[in-house]
Regions:
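Conserved histidines in hydrophobic membrane contexts and catalytic metal-binding motifs
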Residues: 1-366
């Protein structure tokens, strides 16, 4: 049986290996994007000085609105529990546009823009730099990433079968990476032992990542957890610039702040608000509220703990995929696993080429 799995392992790895390397390395580059950006652009994300009480929300929105072109409006404001973090003000367009404002001075600090490096890494990771066709044609980049990720799952599973040791002693030896017995031994150990150390996280990343590639897979994945997958339209419209009264947003913020100890961030928009918390597990978990835009009265509450599986699964998939479910510890492990995943095809190619070379040298002597 192992002979058959060796062939599967080899002939799936050879055509898809380099693509898997690109997917893994670009994914690793994205793990600490937020931390890198906050380190490089501290002037944007943090206030210069915490001084006195923050200015009213309505005043901050007014200061931001003065800088906006016609047709663009404020659609929401996010306020962190960290007094040193600047407020993030969301805009109606373009999609996901926002600016940061100092809540103590009213200074508009600048517009959020994803760094070109991380934008490239994201597009490489998801679509191999391809773009969705406006006429609805085949999205080849997304397709190739999806197929390669699916093949990677089979490569990992076949690798387990090939590697599985027969004795405890063999198990112990097969998990060692020896660096002082030649290059070939080192690359072999890195491929075999490194793959085993990263196996569980690589499988988790691949199996969750496939939900973004294939609707049929997403439907099946959701069904395993008893959830019906919602069909997306393939695009998202930016929030519309509508007439909004911001006068009661401060009242909503103050009330929700009072109700929720230990919150991470409160986001208020027109008629709704969300509260996120610094917890392990689903990093997209949030409590949701609705309010009367005319007077700020809270009219509805939807707590995350009361939501059914359909309201939780997407956030869990994302949290497992990026490794954020267990905080910094699991993110570091995910980063290392992604790097190891990227090296597996490279070390595999090296070992395969060496094997071909040895066979070619041995052939004339037969």
């Amino acid at each position: 049986m192992k002979k058959a799995f060796r062939k599967i392992h080899l002939w799936l790895s050879v055509p898809f290996g380099l693509i898997i390397t690109v997917i893994c390395f670009s994914g690793a580059a994205l793990v600490f994007e937020d931390e890198v950006m906050e380190l490089c652009r501290r002037d944007l994300y943090y206030v210069e000085k915490v001084s006195g009480a923050p200015l009213p929300v309505e005043y901050l929105i007014e200061k931001v609105s003065e800088t906006l072109p016609d047709g663009v409006a404020v659609t929401g404001i996010s306020i962190s529990s960290d007094a040193e973090r600047a407020c993030r003000v969301s805009l109606s367009k373009p999609r996901r546009a926002s600016v940061y404002v100092d809540q103590y001075t009213g200074e508009v600090k600048g517009r959020y823009e994803r760094a070109p490096f991380f934008l490239t890494m994201f597009r490489l990771h998801r679509w191999l730099l391809d773009s969705m066709k406006p006429d609805g044609g085949i999205f080849w980049g997304k397709m190739v990433v999806g197929v390669s990720t699916l093949m990677f799952v089979f490569v990992l599973i076949s690798g387990i079968v090939i590697w599985w040791p027969r004795t405890k002693k063999a198990l112990k030896n097969s998990l060692k990476i020896v660096a002082d017995k030649g290059r070939l031994r080192f690359w072999h150990d890195l491929h075999v032992a490194g793959g085993m150390y990263a196996l569980v996280l690589l499988l988790a990343m691949a199996l969750t990542g496939l939900t973004w590639s294939f609707p049929w897979y997403r439907a099946g994945f959701y069904k395993v957890f008893g959830v019906e997958a919602k069909q997306g339209t393939g695009h998202h419209d930016a929030p519309q610039a509508t007439a909004t009264s911001y006068a009661c947003w401060q009242q909503v913020y103050e009330e929700l702040k009072e109700r929720n100890d230990g919150y991470k961030q409160i986001t208020v928009s027109n008629g709704s608000a969300t509260i996120s918390f610094e917890r392990f597990g689903n990093q997209r978990a949030s409590d949701r509220y609705t309010f009367n835009p005319s007077n700020g009265e809270i009219t509805g509450t939807a707590l995350y703990k009361d939501a059914d599986a359909s309201g939780k699964i997407r956030g869990w998939i994302y949290s497992v995929h990026v490794g954020s479910w267990g905080g910094m510890f699991t993110r570091v492990l995910t980063f290392i696993a992604a790097l190891l995943g990227g090296t597996l095809p490279l070390t595999g190619y090296y070992l395969w080429i060496r094997r071909i070379g040895r066979k070619a040298k041995a052939a004339p002597n037969r």
